Amino acid sequence: MSKRTYQPNNRRRHKVHGFRLRMRTRAGRAILSSRRRKGRKSLAV
């Protein structure tokens, strides 16, 4: 029996999908701007 792959961890969650990480790269800022344009309630984790 294999183990479940999703092992929740808030620190890793923010390091991988967080707002600061998105702001760091040009591609990440593009993600945020497209989510703003779409009107997402939450932009990043």
Curated annotation (Swiss-Prot):
GO terms for cellular component: ribonucleoprotein complex; ribosome. Keywords: Ribonucleoprotein, Ribosomal protein. One of its GO terms (molecular function) is structural constituent of ribosome. One of its GO terms (biological process) is translation. Belongs to the bacterial ribosomal protein bL34 family. PANTHER family: LARGE RIBOSOMAL SUBUNIT PROTEIN BL34M, MITOCHONDRIAL RIBOSOMAL PROTEIN 34 FAMILY MEMBER. This is Large ribosomal subunit protein bL34.
